[in-house]
Amino acid sequence: MHLKTKVTLFAIGWLVLISAAHAYLNVNWAAVLNDYQPVEKRKITVAYLPVTCQLTCPVTDYISKYSTSGEEFMPRMFQGFPEIKEALISNRVQAAFIVAPLALALKAQGVPIKVVYLGHRYGSAVVVQKNGPIKTFADMRGKTVAIPSRFSDERLLLFRAMKVWGIKPGEIRMVEMAPPDVPGALAAHAIDAFAMGEPFPSQAEIGGFGRVLFQAREYWPDYMSCILVVRQDLIDKRPDVVQVLVDGIARSGLWLDTSKPHREDAADFVGRFYYNQKPGLLRWALTKPMDRVTYSPLAPRKADFDMVRDLMIETGVLNKKLEFSEYTDTRFSDNASMQTSWKYEPGIATAK
């Protein structure tokens, strides 16, 4: 065999090997195989971000693998809300954890979705540079603050605080930024502050470059941010699957609120297997203190959503007065109210 032929064959073999390795390591084969299942047997795909406001999504997926019911859905992590929005519209995901104002905005635009459950209460904060010039909210005038989306509860939270301090809308510059990017931006002094959900406020605290100016509950009692939405076609065709999803999320919320060991265990397996974050960071966010973010009860309430809607209209991101019944389906949360916590002891499967 000539040298040229040997080199060519070697190159082809190497290319095949690299391609195979890439496919093995980077292709989600479970998702690929799921797409070939009959529609009525496919597991639904649920979108989420690596934030504690959406912790019940990976917790439900992880614990259900060790329960008698088995895996209930396929979680898919994204890095920002714009990507989730597009995936939801195109039916690449059938359910998603998104911020409440975005859900209302999508519904107003005609996107066929319904809110079926909340993701949490509390868990967001405004963080400033630790040794920076901002000592009180009054010092925010003229400063740049990162928010996850113009359709976010964090943006509305800032407006509520601005009202209290007599700050006009144009006096604070708000910029949209993917949540995982904000700690680095604050550390690099690219922004003066950020309003985000955990664990990013905790990351700034642990890193020594950020200080929590205030928690969301200080300006917004019973604060909520992330909620669970489901496409209408899934509700119409497979309501039983939607109920199983909501039941699982409800059980995870109760499980997380049961004890500190439960939260510490969740910090370990979610940090390692889902969020790609240090478990110590999540432990800080989930336990210092325990009510920094809560996960029960999480049934959608009309008063909460009416307030979000009215704030959106007031701040110019919604031009339609949607009624609660137009964008929610509460039968699933009503049924889930009878659920109990997962019977799962911390540490049972974490080491596997």
Per-region residue spans from a language model:
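Conserved C-terminal helix/tail region of periplasmic/extracytoplasmic solute-binding proteins
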Residues: 310-352
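Short, Lys/Arg-rich N-terminal segment immediately upstream of the first membrane anchor
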Residues: 1-5
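Hydrophobic membrane-insertion alpha-helices, especially the h-region
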Residues: 8-24
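Pocket-lining segment of extracytoplasmic ligand-binding domains
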Residues: 101-102, 132, 180-275
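Secondary-structure end/capping motifs
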Residues: 236-320
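Solvent-exposed, polar/charged alpha-helical surfaces in well-ordered, non-transmembrane soluble domains
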Residues: 55, 86, 90, 104, ...
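Soluble non-cytosolic domains of exported or imported proteins
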Residues: 78-82, 97, 148, 152-153, ...
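Short, glycine-/small- and polar/acidic-enriched structural segments
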Residues: 23-168, 173-176, 192-198, 209-214, ...
